[in-house]
Amino acid sequence: MACRPRSPPGYGSRRDGGASPRSPARWSLGRKRRADGRDRKPEDSEEGELQTADHRPESFTTPEGHKPRSRCSDWASAVEEDEMRTRVNKEIARYKRKLLINDFGRERKSSSGSSDSKESMSSVPADVETDESVLMRRQKQINYGKNTIAYDRYIKEVPRHLRQPGIHPRTPNKFKKYSRRSWDQQIKLWKVALHFWDPPAEEGCDLQEIQPVDLGEMETEFTESSSESQTSSQDNFDVYAGTPTKVRHVDCQVEDEFDLEACLTEPLKDFSAMS
C-alpha cells in the first residue's frame, strides 16, 4: 500500500488563502499604470504605503495651526482666566447671599402682618449682573486700577471707615447691571480720582532737586539793562512770532556787539615786540 508524502506544515493554510493578506507582487510596485489603465502617480504609492502601515484615524493627532503659537503666554493666560473665573463665581454667589440676607432683614422690619408689605419686599432685585464674561471683563479693569501706587497710598492714608461718599473715590460695583458706556465712564472717573494720591515727583523718580534762585543779583543786572530790554522786547517777540526774515534781522541787531568787519580791518599787532 503506497503512502502519500506529508505536506509541510502551513501548506494547507496558504493553499486555502489564510487570514493574512497577500503582499502586492514585486512587479506591481514599479509599474507606470494602475489597474484601470490610467497613469500611475507617485502619490498613489505613498498613500497605499501609509494606509497599510498606519490604520489610525485622522483625529488621532492634533492638527497644527498655520502659525507657531507661544505656549507660555497661552498657558499663563489660561491659568489666569481660570483663576479669575473661579474667583468671580465665588464673589457673585457671596453677593447674592448678601442681598438675600439684607432683603430678609428689611422684610422682617417692614412687615406689619399685612400681605401687601410682604409681597412688596420679598422680591429679589433683578438688576444683578450674572454674565460671566461681563464680570470677568469688569474685574480686569478694576485690577488695572488697583495695581497702582496711587491706590496703595489711598488705602493706607484713608482707611475704609473714614471714607466719605462723594469725597473719596469708591470702586464701582461690578455686580450691578450697567450699560457698557456707563460702566466705562465710572471706571474712568474712578481712575482719575485715584490720581490725587499719586506720589510726588521727588519720591517716584531720581530727578535733581531744583535749587531756589537768588533774585537779588538779577535785580541789579535788570536795572542796568532796563533801557536795552525795553527797546528789544518787541524785537524778541518778533523772533518767536515773526517770519524768518524778521528773525534774521533781529539776530543781526542782537549780535551788533561784535563787528566782524572792524575786526578784520584792524591792523595786526606785533606780539614779538611786546614780548
Swiss-Prot record:
A motif (Nuclear localization signal NLS1) lies at residues 31-34. One of its GO terms (biological process) is mRNA transport. Residues 129-198 are annotated as: RNA-binding. Pfam families: SLBP_RNA_bind. There is a cross-link at residue 98 (Glycyl lysine isopeptide (Lys-Gly) (interchain with G-Cter in SUMO2)). Residues 111-123, 223-233 have a biased composition (Low complexity). One of its GO terms (molecular function) is mRNA binding. A motif (Nuclear localization signal NLS2) lies at residues 96-99. InterPro entries: SLBP1/SLBP2 (IPR026502), SLBP_RNA_bind (IPR029344), SLBP_RNA_bind_sf (IPR038294). GO terms for cellular component: cytoplasm; cytosol; histone mRNA stem-loop binding complex; histone pre-mRNA 3'end processing complex; nucleolus; nucleoplasm; nucleus; ribonucleoprotein complex. The keyword S-adenosyl-L-methionine does not apply. Widely expressed. Expressed in growing primary but not non-growing oocytes, within the primordial follicles. Also detected in fully-grown oocytes in antral follicles (at protein level). It is found in: Cytoplasm; Nucleus. Disruption phenotype: Females show no impaired oogenesis but display a defect in the formation of primordial follicles leading to infertility. Most embryos arrested at the 2-cell stage and fail to complete the second round of DNA replication due to an insufficient supply of histone H3 and H4. Accumulation of histone H2A and H2B is not affected. It comes from the Eukaryota. Belongs to the SLBP family. Amino acids 31-34, 96-99 and 246-249 are necessary for interaction with the Importin alpha/Importin beta receptor. The first 18 amino acids, amino acids 69-76 and 179-182 are necessary for interaction with TNPO3. Amino acids 31-34, 96-99 and 246-249 are necessary for nuclear localization. RNA-binding protein involved in the histone pre-mRNA processing. Binds the stem-loop structure of replication-dependent histone pre-mRNAs and contributes to efficient 3'-end processing by stabilizing the complex between histone pre-mRNA and U7 small nuclear ribonucleoprotein (snRNP), via the histone downstream element (HDE). Plays an important role in targeting mature histone mRNA from the nucleus to the cytoplasm and to the translation machinery. Stabilizes mature histone mRNA and could be involved in cell-cycle regulation of histone gene expression. This is Histone RNA hairpin-binding protein. It comes from Mus musculus (Mouse).
